[in-house]
Regions:
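Terminal-region recognition feature
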Residues: 1-204
C-alpha cells in the first residue's frame, strides 16, 4: 500500500541560490560526523541493500568504538527487502550496545519489525508517527514447481515476521498472523497498545 503525500509550496518563493557541490559535500559530512558522535543512526526511505549496508556499518562502528553505549536508531521507512532488513535486525540484536528505536513518520512493513526490535523500554514514536504491519508480498515467474517453491518460502517469511513481532510486542503468534492478512495501520497510541513501541516521544 503506497501513500502519496502532497508537497505544499508557498505562493511566493525566493529563487534558490546555486548550490556549490563542495559546500554541499562538506555540509553533509559535518552533519554525518555530528550524528555519529551522538551515536544516532537513520533509516530514511526504503530498506534495501544500500541502506542496509550503511546502517549496519554504522552500528558495527559505534559498537567497536564504545561497546555497550546506547545507540539511537531513527526510522522513517515504507519497508522494503526482507533479507536486507534482517541484516539490520540481527545486527541490532547481536551487538552489546542497547539500540533505542524511534519512529519519526512511518514505520511500515519491514520498518515496523525494525522498530519493534529495539531494546525493550527504549522504543519510541513521534506524536504523528504511523506503523503498518502486513504479510510479505512478491512476485515471480517460472515453472509451476518454481512457483510452488516461492509460495512455500513466502509462507516461511510470513511466519518468521509474525513470530518476531509476537515476541517483541507480547502478542500471540496467532493474533499477529491474523493481523498480517491485510495492511494493519496503527497511530502512535495504537502502536503503544500493540506493543511495537513503549513510549510516545514528545520532546527530543
Amino acid at each position: 500500500m503506497n501513500i502519496n503525500y502532497k508537497n505544499f509550496r508557498m505562493e511566493e518563493e525566493s529563487p534558490a541560490s546555486p548550490e556549490n557541490p563542495m559546500e554541499k559535500m562538506m555540509s553533509g559530512w559535518m552533519f554525518d560526523k555530528k550524528f555519529i558522535e551522538q551515536r544516532k543512526v537513520f533509516l530514511w526511505g526504503p530498506v534495501d541493500d544500500k541502506s542496509s549496508k550503511e546502517i549496519t556499518d554504522r552500528l558495527l562502528y559505534l559498537e567497536a568504538i564504545d561497546p555497550g553505549k546506547d545507540i539511537t536508531f531513527y526510522i522513517n521507512s515504507p519497508g522494503g527487502v526482507v533479507t536486507s532488513g534482517m541484516v539490520i535486525y540481527d545486527t541490532m540484536r547481536m551487538i552489546s550496545s542497547p539500540v533505542s528505536t524511534v519512529c519519526m513518520g512511518m514505520a511500515a512493513s519491514m520498518g515496523s519489525i525494525l522498530l519493534s526490535g529495539g531494546t525493550k523500554g527504549k522504543r519510541y514514536i513521534f506524536p504523528h508517527g504511523e506503523v503498518m504491519i502486513h504479510q510479505p508480498s512478491g512476485g515471480g515467474r517460472g515453472t509451476s514447481a518454481d512457483l510452488e517453491i516461492m509460495a512455500v518460502q513466502m509462507q516461511k517469511t510470513k511466519e518468521m515476521g509474525a513470530q518476531l513481532l509476537a515476541d517483541n510486542c507480547g502478542q500471540t503468534f496467532e493474533k499477529v498472523m491474523k493481523d498480517f492478512d491485510r495492511d494493519y495501520w496503527m497511530d502512535a497510541k495504537e502502536s503503544i497498545e500493540y506493543g511495537i513501541v513503549d513510549h510516545l516521544l514528545e520532546k527530543l
